[in-house]
Amino acid sequence: MIIDTTEIETINSFSKLESLKEVYGIIWMLVPIVTLVLGITIGVLVIVWLEREISAGIQQRIGPEYAGPLGILQALADGTKLLLKENLIPSTGDTRLFSIGPSIAVISIFLSYSVIPFGDHLVLADLSIGVFFWIAISSIAPVGLLMSGYGSNNKYSFLGGLRAAAQSISYEIPLALCVLSISLLSNSLSTVDIVEAQSKYGFWGWNLWRQPIGFIVFLISSLAECERLPFDLPEAEEELVAGYQTEYSGIKFGLFYIASYLNLLVSSLFVTVLYLGGWNLSIPYIFVPDIFGINKGGKVFGTLIGIFITLAKTYLFLFIPIATRWTLPRLRMDQLLNLGWKFLLPISLGNLLLTTSSQLLSL
């Protein structure tokens, strides 16, 4: 039997092409993920810098100014310092839970960004249940905090973990009910559909005006979920040293630091998507394209404008939680639980019933 060498070469070339296609397919899948991770990292660095500058302004002092221009590289300097510190592990604690806890907290929050639309269909995963995917994923983070507190074998850490779990359960329900009210107005659980539903009537079509009570409840609940003052009981310094972070150092302590700002950023992004119209400007932008001769209907220009508007709304909203940190005193644990169960839960239920009734009457 004579084997034609040209046939063998043809088969080999086809197999190489198939393998190259697979490699390119994998690279094409990784590009948006890597881009999103880099964007989130830069966003967190900007939040840290903004918080320090705003805090310095509120307290009438000078903020960071030596690490880079206007101190913008101070967060990188702090991160480098944490990387170089020794990673201590308690000898009497559960080392597995102690090591896994910070990773669970960070990864669960990172996954929430996959359903956030930064522009017109510029979203990593346009799921039909996008908003409830975020709620389900965000409820995993307190599990990591509880594991960290238990694995530290420290009474302060364990109490901090228990507080984090109790606080998350108390405020997750009002948050979910507010999201359900928004979904009823938009007839969809997709984040993209919710933004598009707000674009029909421009500025006055934002859910902020249609759901003012839900917006206030969502704001308070998201602050509690982020463990920001006045809801930072899981890491209250005067009572629990540093809560579930007490025994941590080095990169693991840095992961908790990153997780808190990741959670703050994702909550602000969801406020923008659910209540502030997302990527829609709602104001005609004729002046800038006409000056530079840019096609306003172009896809690239529209995408860039959408990203800019989403981030601008998000960072403007971030002033509220940053200013709140230096304005309000910390609540007691009983006050925190009473606020969640006795006030926010009935209000969010009433808001949901009103929304349902209005939707039924409009049919």
Swiss-Prot record:
GO biological process per UniProt: aerobic respiration; photosynthesis, light reaction
Enzyme type, top EC level: translocase
Keywords (alphabetical) are: Chloroplast, Membrane, NAD, NADP, Plastid, Plastoquinone, Quinone, Thylakoid, Translocase, Transmembrane, Transmembrane helix
Give Gene Ontology CC terms.
chloroplast thylakoid membrane
Q: Where are the transmembrane segments?
A: 30-50, 98-118, 127-147, 165-185, 203-223, 248-268, 300-320, 336-356
Q: Which family does it belong to?
A: Belongs to the complex I subunit 1 family.
Entry protein name: NAD(P)H-quinone oxidoreductase subunit 1, chloroplastic
Species of provenance? Solanum lycopersicum
User: Gene for this protein?
Assistant: ndhA
